């Protein structure tokens, strides 16, 4: 059901490319209106299910023990009111997606057209799912939101938590293996490549050793940052504006604006120390052998 809803919403957002193949200009308004009506009605039924599930869960818990993130997800709005509020956000979603697609087209020399980016790129598919899911997440529907992003995860290999905050003009190139955690914050005009992880380094626990929910534990990536393939960035650290993070870098500390971080830089100090220690050990061993050969005759 959710897959059909997402397909309907995407078709309504981009009727000329994701709508009917024989759609005429004079029929666009009707198509968009009808498609939205069907998708939103089906979404109402899904919202009812989540709210029912939430109510059942709440009845089993002491409300005073809910943490801030759980409490924020409890809503008193009716399903129709929530979906109506969601629908009001769709024009904004379309505008954001336009910037994402434009960024991909301008940032990838292999892209022949914006249409190719829209219909072919897995990163675009994942971002469409994320943009829709994020609105639902903000409206207090974390289950539906997570299910939507997991549909994209299954289809593209790109795992974006709907709670992440991502600015305009976001481009994921290739995409397979990308992971963006729940509390990650990504600025404008950010480009990331395949197998990048924006994850948590550690998280606080309660007195029973259970992880606390909702704590900020993922990176903040400022505007105009590029993160190349295989980079792993962990913890609540900040990647300064205009920085470039090289391939396969393991990063657990903040870097200032304009930084250019490479794997060689990250490994330079440990490698130099290790090399020095190895050379020293080899030299000492050789000297010891020479000294020993002078002091003790070698048996033949």
What are these regions (language model features)?
Residues 1-147, 277-300:
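Terminal amphipathic alpha-helical/low-complexity segments used for targeting or macromolecular assembly
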Residues 146, 150-154:
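Core catalytic architecture of nucleotide-activated donor-dependent transferases building glycoconjugates
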Residues 153-273:
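Structural signal for interior beta-strand "rungs" in well-ordered beta-sheet cores
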């Amino acid at each position: 059901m959710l897959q059909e809803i997402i397909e309907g919403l995407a078709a309504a957002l981009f009727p000329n490319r994701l709508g009917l193949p024989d759609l005429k200009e004079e029929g666009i308004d009707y198509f968009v209106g009808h498609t939205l009506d069907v998708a939103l009605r089906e979404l109402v039924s899904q919202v009812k299910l989540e709210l029912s599930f939430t109510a059942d869960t709440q009845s089993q818990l002491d409300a005073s023990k809910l943490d801030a993130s759980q409490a924020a997800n409890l809503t008193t709005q009716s399903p129709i009111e929530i979906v109506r509020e969601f629908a009001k956000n769709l024009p904004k979603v379309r505008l954001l997606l336009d910037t994402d697609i434009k960024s991909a087209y301008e940032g990838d020399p292999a892209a022949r057209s914006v249409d190719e980016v829209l219909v072919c790129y897995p990163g675009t598919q994942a971002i469409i799912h994320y943009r829709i899911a994020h609105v639902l997440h903000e409206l207090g529907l974390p289950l539906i939101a997570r299910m939507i992003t997991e549909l994209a995860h299954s289809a593209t290999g790109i795992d974006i938590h709907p709670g992440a905050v991502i600015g305009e003009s976001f481009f994921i190139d290739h995409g397979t293996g990308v992971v963006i955690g729940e509390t990650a914050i990504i600025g404008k005009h950010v480009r990331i490549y395949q197998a990048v992880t924006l994850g948590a380094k550690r998280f606080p626990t309660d007195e029973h050793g259970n992880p606390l929910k909702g704590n900020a534990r993922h990176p903040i990536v400022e505007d105009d940052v590029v993160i190349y393939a295989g980079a792993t960035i962990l913890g609540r650290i900040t990647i300064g504006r205009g920085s470039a993070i090289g391939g396969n870098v393991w990063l657990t500390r903040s870097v200032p604006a304009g930084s250019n971080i490479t794997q060689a830089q990250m490994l330079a100090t440990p490698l130099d120390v290790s090399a020095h220690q190895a050379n020293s050990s080899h030299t000492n061993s050789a000297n010891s052998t020479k000294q020993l050969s002078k002091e003790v005759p070698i048996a033949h």
